[in-house]
């Protein structure tokens, strides 16, 4: 097992590790002034996110979406939290939905109620998540796979397509540098406030 694989999703170790670092979801949120405050508050005062039908639909179809990514990418489903390479980078975290064997290609999976016909119509927070995951894993390419959902007359959520739509997303070093800067500032704020709460400043 790769030494940068920290814990599997849903385990106590996974939750503990995420609280000690900055994940793709967190740094994407923290990339605006209001989002930074919210991300900091969430880190210092974590609360459980209420479950809903959209989230359950996403979980139910995540494995299916990964399995429908062409085999040429060599992607396998992943639920391990991984950290960035190099000493002192253990706090830079990501859980890509899929990885190939040498981590040169990752996958990110989404379900949505709205089509994204072009790359730039993908919500910016998702594009930021992808770039952070590319940074943490060191991958050069992300296969972004998304599935449109529809609602039946009786309120059930079902796939609107027979297969997910795919985008190939390359590394954006400018965005990655911005995300690293944001993540470092957030991590510093988290450490400062935690030390203040413990009275160790």
Predicted regions and their residues:
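Long, compositionally biased, charged low-complexity segments
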Residues: 17, 194-195
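Charged, glycine-rich intrinsically disordered N-terminal tails and low-complexity linkers that flank
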Residues: 1-60, 64, 68, 72, ...
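Nucleic-acid nuclease catalytic cores
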Residues: 72-194
């Amino acid at each position: 097992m790769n030494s940068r694989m920290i814990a599997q999703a849903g385990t106590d170790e996974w939750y503990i590790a995420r609280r000690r670092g900055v994940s793709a979801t967190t740094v994407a949120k923290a990339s605006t002034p209001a989002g930074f405050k919210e991300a900091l508050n969430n880190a210092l005062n974590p609360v459980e996110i209420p479950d809903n039908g959209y989230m359950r639909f996403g979980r139910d179809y995540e494995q299916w979406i990964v399995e429908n990514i062409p085999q040429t990418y060599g992607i396998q489903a992943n639920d391990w939290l991984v950290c960035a390479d190099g000493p002192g980078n253990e706090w830079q975290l990501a859980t890509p939905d899929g990885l190939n064997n040498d981590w040169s290609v990752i996958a990110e999976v989404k379900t949505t109620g709205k089509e994204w016909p072009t790359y730039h119509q993908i919500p910016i927070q998702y594009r930021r998540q992808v770039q952070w995951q590319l940074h943490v894993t060191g991958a050069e390419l992300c296969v972004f796979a998304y599935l449109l959902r529809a609602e039946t007359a009786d309120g059930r959520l079902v796939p609107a397509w027979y297969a997910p739509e795919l985008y190939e997303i390359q590394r954006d070093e400018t965005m990655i540098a911005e995300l690293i800067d944001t993540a470092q500032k957030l991590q510093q704020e988290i450490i400062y406030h935690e030390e203040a709460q413990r009275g160790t400043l």
